[in-house]
């Protein structure tokens, strides 16, 4: 998982993969923790992610330390994507021009009941649009 969005965009462009931006409150958000446990930390998800996306974790912890740079980056991205609740997962392509990064959104989701297969079915729907 990347925490630096600029680095993730560069990798995504190089590998021709969209970003999966995971907006989470890792140390306080119950649904975020469930999504991690039930989907994001499973072998099925790991295999799928390696083939399809570049993973970016944008964390908004209450107790855990974050550098000022990461905190600022995450706040800007939360605003840019209009995230109002956690967990939120955005699929997007990032394009950097003249030092500025713009995102082309492919879709968003959050917690989906039913484990990895149910969650990945939703994710694959967004990625299928990318190929059109």
Feature annotation, model-predicted:
Residues 24-40:
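Conserved redox-active cysteine motifs that mediate thiol-disulfide chemistry
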Residues 38-40, 76-131:
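Non-catalytic, surface beta->alpha helical segment in thiol-disulfide oxidoreductase systems
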Residues 1-2, 24, 38, 45-72:
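Thiol-based oxidoreductase modules, predominantly thioredoxin-like and allied folds used
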Residues 23-26, 58-61, 92-94, 109:
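Active-site-proximal beta-strand/loop segments in catalytic clefts of secreted hydrolases
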Residues 16, 24-28, 85:
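Short pre-active-site segment immediately N-terminal to redox-active cysteine/selenocysteine motifs
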Residues 29-32, 65-66, 98-101:
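Extracytoplasmic/secreted cell-surface and envelope-processing proteins
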Residues 1-19, 49:
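A short beta-strand-turn-helix
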Residues 20-21, 55, 89:
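Hydrophobic beta-strand anchors of alpha/beta hydrolase catalytic cores
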């Amino acid at each position: 998982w990347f925490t630096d969005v600029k680095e993730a965009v560069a990798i995504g462009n190089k590998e021709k993969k969209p970003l999966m931006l995971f907006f989470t409150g890792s140390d306080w958000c119950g649904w975020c923790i469930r999504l991690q446990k039930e989907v994001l930390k499973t072998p099925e998800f790991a295999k799928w992610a390696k083939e399809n996306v570049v993973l970016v974790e944008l964390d908004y912890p209450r107790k855990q330390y974050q550098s000022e740079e990461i905190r600022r980056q995450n706040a800007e991205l939360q605003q840019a994507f209009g995230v109002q609740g956690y967990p939120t997962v955005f699929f997007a392509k990032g394009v950097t021009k003249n030092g500025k990064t713009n995102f082309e959104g492919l879709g968003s989701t959050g917690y989906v009941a039913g484990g990895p297969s149910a969650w990945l079915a939703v994710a694959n729907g967004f990625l299928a649009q990318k190929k059109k």
